[in-house]
């Protein structure tokens, strides 16, 4: 344990207020009563409640504070969950807290899927699954994590666990402007970032100076592209850059070498790729609540391209539901976006389908650029690199692209 860990900030929230590990321990010891549903606003309060459930071996449901009361009711969630009085206990120091959490029995964390294809589902995770690929050792004791994800979603929880179990500080960057994010990275000495490609594209559009103190940059949640990686290497020259694959249903499963993913040791036999679609064995999944029996193989909806079979290596090419049907021809929007961001000055792009009475849908693009808004030159550039059907019929220049609460690009 780092000397002085008690005084180290546990988290610095979006307003600049901090909660130290010493203060966290005091709150955990004094906590009464315990409620099994967390509908709090703010990462500091949310992660305090997760730490409480973890240290006491309890089950906790995290509910996004942006969910409306009727949506919560549809999920069968009782926001006024019964109170439970907790038995007294002591925490002499932070090391005792972390040891108690690592050996806690009975802890379960219930999360909601993003609900991008309907009402969210409830998925229960246990400590072993949530920490499957976390690294805890003395070499990580000085890491400072930027929290770029929604704290009620799987990616945010895993950033919390990686930081918390090493007694690291988290700096809340979620929902902040690019200028504020850059300022807070410098001010608080952030060394590790984990975020979606959309988050990085929005940030890089504003950042002009390198940030050499950042040592690790991880991308997840969406497909990335070589142009983004090149730009990340410019702004974060000291950082190791990697992609990760995680989902609310399964947690983190794959790491990457560039844009090529590989399963962690021991789970290769629990991965199947059929007709380009990634499937996971149900033993890798959390427990679905109220969904009946889950079939043996779970369809992730992710389309992949196999690079090698022994050992298994593959690339993600997009989400099955994101493909756009243009008069019978299916187009992967991420393929078009990858070409758009190759055009000089283009920092981000969104490709989507718009309803059309003749062909069903037409291909549209929104583009963020720091250069001249030359649509003709951009169309010529795309025409030289893509089949004609993949060149958007409608191109609109915009100042920013919409993103979801999970930090991903909104396509609908």
Predicted regions and their residues:
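Conserved AMP-binding A3 loop
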Residues: 100, 107-135
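Gly/Ser/Thr-rich phosphate-binding loop
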Residues: 206-260
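Conserved AMP-binding/adenylate-forming core of the ANL superfamily
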Residues: 3-33, 72, 125-128
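Conserved AMP-binding/adenylation subdomain of ANL enzymes
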Residues: 132-144, 152-191
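Conserved ATP/PPi-binding loop(s) of AMP-dependent carboxylate-activating enzymes
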Residues: 273-311, 319, 329-331
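Conserved pre-ATP/AMP-binding loop-to-beta segment of ANL
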Residues: 2-7, 41, 91-112, 139-145
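AMP-binding/adenylate-forming catalytic domain of the ANL superfamily
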Residues: 387-409
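AMP-binding/adenylate-forming catalytic core of the ANL superfamily
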Residues: 193, 301-390, 400
């Amino acid at each position: 344990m780092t000397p002085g860990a008690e005084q180290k900030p546990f988290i610095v929230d979006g307003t600049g207020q901090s909660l130290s590990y010493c203060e966290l321990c005091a709150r955990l010891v004094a906590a009464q009563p315990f409620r099994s549903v967390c509908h709090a606003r703010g990462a500091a309060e949310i992660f305090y409640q997760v730490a409480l459930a973890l240290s006491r071996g309890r089950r906790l449901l995290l509910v996004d504070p942006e969910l409306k009361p009727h949506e919560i009711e549809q999920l069968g969630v009782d926001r006024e969950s019964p109170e439970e009085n907790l038995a007294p206990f002591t925490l002499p120091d932070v090391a005792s807290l972390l040891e108690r959490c690592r050996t806690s029995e009975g802890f379960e964390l219930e999360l909601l899927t993003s609900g991008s294809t309907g009402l969210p589902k409830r998925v229960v995770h246990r400590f072993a699954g949530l920490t499957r690929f976390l690294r805890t050792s003395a070499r990580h004791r000085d890491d400072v994590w930027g929290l770029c994800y929604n704290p009620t979603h799987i990616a945010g929880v895993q950033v919390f666990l990686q930081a918390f179990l090493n007694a690291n500080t988290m700096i809340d960057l979620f929902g902040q402007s690019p200028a504020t994010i850059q300022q807070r990275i410098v001010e608080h000495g952030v060394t590790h970032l984990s975020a979606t490609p959309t988050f990085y594209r929005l940030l890089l559009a504003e950042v002009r100076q390198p940030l050499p103190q950042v040592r690790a940059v991880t991308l997840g949640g969406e497909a990335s592209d070589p142009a983004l990686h090149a730009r990340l290497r410019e702004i974060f020259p000291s950082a190791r850059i990697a992609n990760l694959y995680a989902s609310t249903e399964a947690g983190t499963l794959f790491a990457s070498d560039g844009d090529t993913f590989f399963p962690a040791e021991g789970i290769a036999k629990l991965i199947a790729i059929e007709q380009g679609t990634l499937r996971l064995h149900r033993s890798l999944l959390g427990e679905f609540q109220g969904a009946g029996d889950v079939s043996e193989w779970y369809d992730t909806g992710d389309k992949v391209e196999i690079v090698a079979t022994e050992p298994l290596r593959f690339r993600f090419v997009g989400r099955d539901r994101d493909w756009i049907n243009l008069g019978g021809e299916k187009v992967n929007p991420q393929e078009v976006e990858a070409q758009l961001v190759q055009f000089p000055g283009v920092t981000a792009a969104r490709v989507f389908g718009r309803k059309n009475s003749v062909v069903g849908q037409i291909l549209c693009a929104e583009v963020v650029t720091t250069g001249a808004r030359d649509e003709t030159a951009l169309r010529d550039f795309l025409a030289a690199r893509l089949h004609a059907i993949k060149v958007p019929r409608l191109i609109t220049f915009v100042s920013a692209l919409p993103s979801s609460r999970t930090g991903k690009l909104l396509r609908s």
